[in-house]
């Protein structure tokens, strides 16, 4: 008993610990109460402004009681759903699936047959555990890889397994990615079934065909939409559910799934790219093109737009327009409404004007059809004339907002002509020059420039000319590029010359300064940039690892701004190069005046600058020696170019150009320069073969052909020459040569060795006559 008795010191220590724990509990409770009060205060402040609709927090958390005070009619039915918990995988199961994921990622299988057997076993093991697997942090990647490898029958069985739980899955951090992958991979099947090209896969032995396998993919998508229908208002701004909703909208509309614009709409930049060996074989060509979709999908889009906005008024939509997660979804809804239902709406409007008696009722129907646009800008375009109206206030509040301006860009791009004319006349037109100066408002203003008529564009250019120096100082090169391109499209030669004159004056009234300033060639090159991008001494993988270690983990804001300005400046140079006349001449003069070190910096620094040189080589020359001067600046650095990520593309472009121009000033590189390049490449053949970029250049230039059969290489290199030049360079017979030479000689020509003094003794003062030689 004495051993178990605590000492006085221990009792005092335990008492202190107990008091400390009590204080911590009280502090936590007090903090929770304050947090709850703060959330309630924020909700009360936003509730009247947002008409009882408040988007969920940005961190993805969702409080089931956060909307309890809002009326049921305004917040939509069953918004406060209870998320399901599907349980956790056992340790043995988790280890098995994790090992399977590693094997699929490494593709470490002795043969394709063993890989197929392994996949079949994984599918069998996964049966009945799909929900646990999809919501598992460590195994959801395996589910995505299996979806990429699944056939149509297996995808339908996954729809069956996920059915009834989609709302919990699409709002889950990990399962939402699996749902998106399933939706996107199943979209081409709808088109195949619609066109009759789909063939049912044979059922494996011992497996029964379920109702989902018998159903069409169209029905499975519609059943999924029915399940999500009650929660559309919540999914608009949910951190994970909004991505799944965007994916469904893109699928229903039939838009291409593999386009860059579609991918950026569906996923964030931080999204992990998951793939697996064999996924490309299962990929459908329909993903990269516009797909035919059934009429039920079009009706489903219309219903989604109506249901999503039915629970909100105009004020709630404005709150959603500035929400980081809800804004992209709202953009897509607005774009689909204007592009898919806009033309039908205009036709109905014309028919409605015929009947005066039913005008009011039909006007209400029209407003219901354009619910989203009508709620954002009511009574447009007439309302834009008064700055106090709801429509004008909405546009003015979105112009300078970094998130809301994106929705405004979509509205400007796709809105009907009447509404755009009102926007241009009353809001953007009078202050276009000040909007183009602003770093946020310039993007909606650029969208306006893309739709202006020739007269309005000339007026905008006239207002913008005094601001050219300000555009250059602030780096608004995208604005200058748009002005040049639109004037070129509208055939505004005078406006183009005025813009070029203003741009040149901003750079010291000298064309030679344009390219160095826009491409930042005047700045001192750091020691790291001066080193050639070669991997001569170390392997390619080691060089890449060393490069990654040298690069900072997080890019500073200054570096981001510099890269941003370099990108837009290079795009402006490339745009000017394609505009015939003075702009192209100015850029070619500036490129020809560059020093060899500056040309090499352009060739190896970035993709944007190297693409300028490629485009310059493919552009007709204003001066005959332009292409020759440009290539001669690169000749001393052929090996550095061949092992450079960006410079290798320039070498590959040079060999595709003809040696003799088909027309005067057409793109061409003299043949002796090509021979100089291939001879330098041959000196470094061994080093080139050690790198992927070097092998690519050697293969493109047909280096092996040069080494073993040089006359064949010469014939191949001259295949790009125009036909007349190749015929002229071909060897001819002796008789044909003599005949051509005789035709070229002037009449009365007596030959190269004819001596008139000797002819005097033979003929005297008489004319020289040719004697006939008898047989």
Swiss-Prot record:
Disulfide bond entries: none
Record bears the keyword rRNA processing: yes
Keywords in alphabetical order: Nucleus, Repeat, Ribosome biogenesis, rRNA processing
Pfam families hit by this protein: PUF_NOP9
Record's GO cellular component terms: 90S preribosome; nucleolus; preribosome, small subunit precursor
Cellular location(s): Nucleus, Nucleolus
Pumilio repeat start-end pairs: 125-160, 161-196, 227-267, 390-425, 633-679
Compositionally skewed regions (Basic and acidic residues) per UniProt: 11-41, 345-366, 732-746, 766-775
Bias (Basic residues) ranges: 1-10
InterPro entries: ARM-like, ARM-type_fold, NOP9, Pumilio_RNA-bd_rpt
Predominant location category: nucleus
Region (Disordered) residue spans: 1-79, 345-367, 525-557, 720-775
Molecular function in Gene Ontology: RNA binding
A GO BP annotation: endonucleolytic cleavage in 5'-ETS of tricistronic rRNA transcript (SSU-rRNA, 5.8S rRNA, LSU-rRNA)
Similarity comment: family membership: Belongs to the NOP9 family.
Function as written in the Swiss-Prot or TrEMBL entry: RNA-binding nucleolar protein required for pre-rRNA processing. Involved in production of 18S rRNA and assembly of small ribosomal subunit.
Protein name: Nucleolar protein 9
Underlying gene: nop9
